[in-house]
């Protein structure tokens, strides 16, 4: 494979991994421990 193809595959895999981890953190089992500052304050 050419170097450019390998770089594109690496960057794409990295972005997909970061996105997957972010979605898992936001909506997965650990999300119950996250606090929402907007729900803590009454208007």
From Swiss-Prot:
One of the record's GO cellular component terms: chloroplast thylakoid membrane
The keyword Chloroplast belongs to this UniProt entry's keyword annotation: yes
Keywords: Chloroplast, Membrane, Plastid, Thylakoid, Transmembrane, Transmembrane helix
Primary subcellular site in the record, as a coarse category: plastid
Location(s) in or outside the cell: Plastid, Chloroplast thylakoid membrane
Pfam families, per the entry: PsbN
GO biological process assignments: photosynthesis
Annotated TM spans: 7-29
Presence of the UniProt keyword Chloroplast in the record: yes
Family according to the record: Belongs to the PsbN family.
Role this protein plays: May play a role in photosystem I and II biogenesis.
Protein name: Protein PsbN
Organism whose genome encodes this protein: Phaeodactylum tricornutum (strain CCAP 1055/1)
């Amino acid at each position: 494979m050419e170097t450019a193809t390998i770089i594109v595959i690496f960057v794409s895999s990295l972005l997909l991994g970061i996105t997957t981890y972010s979605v898992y953190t936001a909506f997965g089992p650990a999300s119950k421990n996250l606090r929402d500052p907007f729900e803590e304050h009454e208007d």
